[in-house]
Amino acid sequence: MSVPAELKYAKSHEWIKLEADGTVTVGITQHAQELLGDMVFVELPKVGRILAQQEDCAVVESVKAASDIYAPLSGEVIAINAEVESSPEKINEDSYSAWLFKLKPANTAEIDGLLDANGYEKLLESDAH
């Protein structure tokens, strides 16, 4: 399984990409979408919503289960990916390009608490045993 090195990861299987303008893009990992299976519904947070770190803020539903998505960082939702709301299967096609929402972080120090690719791979290995 490919774990992109340029991203950071939450233990709850969300990824973040730090953008050049200081905002972050959030999605779910390949591992998460594989566990869930074929996506059928996505509910994203409203633009302007203020999120606390680890607050449940979105829902993805698959043919197997529904799962909450947690904010990997605190901040304000500044954009959502309406394309995945109308075509949830895009998450299955490529979970790293089918982002869910963008945040303006309230506290960039929280990024340091997230896992790097190596740390996330170790988490997956420990989950497998």
From Swiss-Prot:
Record's keyword annotation contains Cytoplasm: no
Domain of life: Bacteria
Cofactor(s) of this protein: (R)-lipoate
Gene Ontology cellular component annotations, sorted alphabetically: cytosol; glycine cleavage complex
Gene label: gcvH
HAMAP family xrefs: GcvH
Entry's Gene Ontology BP terms: glycine decarboxylation via glycine cleavage system
Function: The glycine cleavage system catalyzes the degradation of glycine. The H protein shuttles the methylamine group of glycine from the P protein to the T protein.
Family statement: Belongs to the GcvH family.
UniProt keyword annotation of GTP-binding present: no
Database matches in PANTHER family: GLYCINE CLEAVAGE SYSTEM H PROTEIN, GLYCINE CLEAVAGE SYSTEM H PROTEIN-RELATED
Protein name, per record: Glycine cleavage system H protein
Cofactor note: Binds 1 lipoyl cofactor covalently.
Alphabetized UniProt keyword annotations: Lipoyl
CDD domains per UniProt: GCS_H
Disulfide bond positions: none
InterPro entries per record: 2-oxoA_DH_lipoyl-BS, Biotin_lipoyl, GCV_H, GCV_H/Fam206, GCV_H_sub, Single_hybrid_motif
Record note on quaternary structure: The glycine cleavage system is composed of four proteins: P, T, L and H.
Domain Lipoyl-binding residue range list: 23-104
Residues the record lists as N6-lipoyllysine modifications: K64
